[in-house]
């Protein structure tokens, strides 16, 4: 083979290889440009008029399902989408439901505010307590908690001695006899002179037996804490031996107290235990 033919064959091969490489590069460039145009929406064609309002103020958005045959447009005047070759739907952008949700949320907040206001302003309504003044338990922002107890005690001092001490103003005995003028938790037949105090207090009944009642910190007499006093020497006459036993502790009634306030005997130096004998008698300790 001639050397000239060999050179010509080599040149042809190089030309073909270079041409194929160049064509491949051109194809890649074309594909990249097409992708860019598709992403920009330039292949959607010219700006089309809106099929609803016939406004030219439209723009290309995207292709449905990545199909070039279904370009989707948006009309800026009527603010609606449409797809070329598809059906028209009267659905605005965002829809009117979003505004409705905002209005409903604002109305809901207003209702909550009204409920909270009514909760603080409305007086306490209880079908069991009808004669109670609203200022006794009604919450007021301008009154402190300490002042609330002061007003409650002031209302008690202005009431009668035989009326219940919660300011109910009448015969209100839920657990006791309806004829007795006792507080809420009055339990036995007889008329007791109840009063509002903090600590221990006694009531005088028709059975002539002194009783000690436990009053809670809110001035409410507790039925479970009411226990009868019993003499240590098992004598029914209270004048012979005024020493009493209450919850296992010896108490002594002074002569000036007249059966109203129990006091601890200052002369007792030792308790001699909780269950020791006292004057040859057993201590009857009631369980609370």
Curated annotation (Swiss-Prot):
UniProt keyword Zinc present: yes
Ranges for region Disordered: 97-120
Protein location: Nucleus
Native source species: Arabidopsis thaliana (Mouse-ear cress)
One biological process term in Gene Ontology: regulation of DNA-templated transcription
GO molecular function, one term: transcription cis-regulatory region binding
Protein name: Dof zinc finger protein DOF2.1
Domain of life: Eukaryota
Alphabetized Pfam families for the sequence: Zn_ribbon_Dof
Keyword field contains Glycosyltransferase: no
Renumbered zinc finger spans (Dof-type): 48-102
Key words, A-Z: DNA-binding, Metal-binding, Nucleus, Transcription, Transcription regulation, Zinc, Zinc-finger
InterPro entries named in the record: Dof, Znf_Dof
């Amino acid at each position: 083979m001639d050397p000239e033919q060999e050179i010509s064959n080599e040149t042809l091969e190089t030309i073909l290889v270079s041409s194929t490489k160049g064509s491949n590069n051109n194809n890649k460039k074309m594909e990249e440009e097409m992708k860019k145009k598709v992403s920009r929406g330039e292949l959607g064609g010219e700006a089309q008029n809106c099929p609803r309002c016939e406004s030219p103020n439209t723009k290309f958005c995207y292709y449905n399902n990545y199909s070039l045959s279904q370009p989707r447009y948006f009309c800026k005047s009527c603010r609606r989408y449409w797809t070329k070759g598809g059906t028209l739907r009267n659905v605005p952008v965002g829809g009117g439901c979003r505004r409705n949700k905002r209005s409903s949320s604002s109305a809901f907040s207003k209702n909550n505010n009204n409920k909270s206001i009514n909760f603080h302003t409305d007086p306490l309504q209880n079908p069991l307590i009808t004669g109670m003044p609203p200022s006794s338990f009604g919450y007021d922002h301008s009154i402190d908690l300490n002042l609330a107890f002061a007003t409650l005690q002031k209302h008690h001092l202005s009431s009668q001695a035989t009326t219940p001490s919660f300011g109910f103003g009448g015969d209100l005995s839920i657990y006791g006899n309806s004829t007795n003028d006792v507080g809420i938790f009055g339990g036995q037949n007889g008329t007791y002179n109840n009063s509002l105090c903090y600590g221990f207090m006694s009531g005088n009944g028709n059975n002539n037996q002194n009783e000690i009642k436990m009053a809670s910190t809110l001035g409410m007499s507790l039925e479970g804490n009411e226990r009868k006093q019993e003499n240590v020497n098992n004598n029914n006459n209270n004048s012979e031996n005024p020493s009493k036993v209450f919850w296992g502790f010896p108490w002594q009634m002074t002569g000036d107290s007249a059966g109203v306030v129990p006091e601890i005997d200052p002369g007792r130096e030792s308790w001699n235990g909780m269950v020791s004998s006292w004057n040859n008698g057993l201590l009857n300790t009631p369980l609370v």
